Amino acid sequence: MTGFCTRDEASLRDAAAAAVEQARALGVDAASATVRAGGGISIKVRGGVAESAVRDAYQSLSLTVYRDGRTGGASTVALDDASIARVVAEAHAIAGLVQPDADAGLANFETLAWDGPAPEMFAHSGQSPESLMARALELEALTADAAAQASGSVRAGEVAVGSSDHLSALATSAGFCRSIAASTHTQWATALADDPNGPSVREYAQASDRRFDALGPVSAQARQAVERAVAQRGGRSIAGRRAPVLFEARIAPTLIHALTQALFGQAQHSRASWLAGALGTEIAADHLDLFEDPLEPFGMASGGWDHEGVAGSRRAIIARGRCQGYFLGSRSARKLGMRSTGNADGPWNLILSSHAPGGTAAAMRQAMDTGLIVTQLQGGGSDPVTGNWTQAVSGFWVEGGEIVHPVIDVTLGGRLPDMWRRVVAVGEDRERQGAVRTGSILVDDMQIGGRA
């Protein structure tokens, strides 16, 4: 047993290897099996009482087989011998019903992470249900105290604390069989501020990390949630115009996700990307770098290999604005005549940085002078082929580098190729949201759609 998990890594490797061995016995050309298991505790509190307290556990096995160029897959949540045999039979049968694909199949032998490094990601919290409940109650009480000290009508919303551990094992018919363990811990708080001239404002603050001790004091989340809610009271729309836009650090990863999705192998080989064929070309302002690091200790998107067994590498995705690489799994790499980059599951940890001056959040406001700070996205999206981007947003209007008033009921519109070329600064107010670490991002000109 590993942390909150009810199984251990060895048993997962055995189950994955057994599924592959049985599939090969049925005559398939190749097979791979991924087995996952995990568990944890999550606590939610509202109004000083527990709203939910859950101790959960899960396990699953997914099998993929290749036969005569055809691919079949099946999965189960039971790991007994009979269930594994049933999954093998189902995957084998499905492979006989689909069209062949010459580019499907296991990762190339030489690309597999046979004995490469696996980053440290496991850090069991050692927390009990009682200690997590106490932490959640403390977070809620501190949020309520901060709300009581704020001006106007403010109250604590739901708060939550969670701690979990996860295991994963991969086996393939090429002989690859490795496993890895990871932990994830979270805490977040919400606050609601009544606005006599409009709808109530709901804001939040959160922290997540592989290490429980790195979540920081609950007082920080409590205070930040209340301060954000109070600051957003009295929001109003503005007239449509063109102006600079500063994306707050916790929102900025949305722009990075839109960029990286255009560099996925599937988007590239199908030409369904606004960055089709972008390798080696300028795709962003020439002061920007985007770096990928799969081996960051305790990184939220770290890993020793993807679900095909291919290791990622520390590498530049963008260097001085130029595209240096795509995110490729084996199938998309073959279709492009390239080599897998170990990104069959998507990007590893990403870090956006700039060679241009940035600064604190206040310095970024001063650099913008007059424009819109975006603090929340409220609906919209982008066209992956054209790069057209539209979002309903809220935030703050700034003049002379100072916040004038909160802003609601506005939309932003632009084209992602133009937006990335018009980034003039990245702040030093860096935050990590999932796989992405970035500061605030300043775009020097965008279309703002408000009330006439």
Task: Kindly give the residue locations of the regions a language model identified.
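Acidic low-complexity segments
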Residues: 1-16, 30-42, 82, 86-178, ...
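A generic local secondary-structure boundary/capping motif
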Residues: 21-23, 50-54, 127-131, 139-150, ...
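Translation machinery proteins
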Residues: 29-57, 61
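Short acidic, glycine/serine/threonine-rich loops at helix termini
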Residues: 42-47, 164-183, 199-205, 255-261, ...
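N-terminal cap/recognition module
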Residues: 50-95
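Short beta-strand elements
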Residues: 54-67, 178-207, 318-319, 393-400
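Residue-level structural signal for beta-strand termini and adjacent loop
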Residues: 76-78, 205, 329, 409-410
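Dual-mode signal for accessory low-complexity, basic/Gly-rich regions
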Residues: 150, 222, 262, 276-452
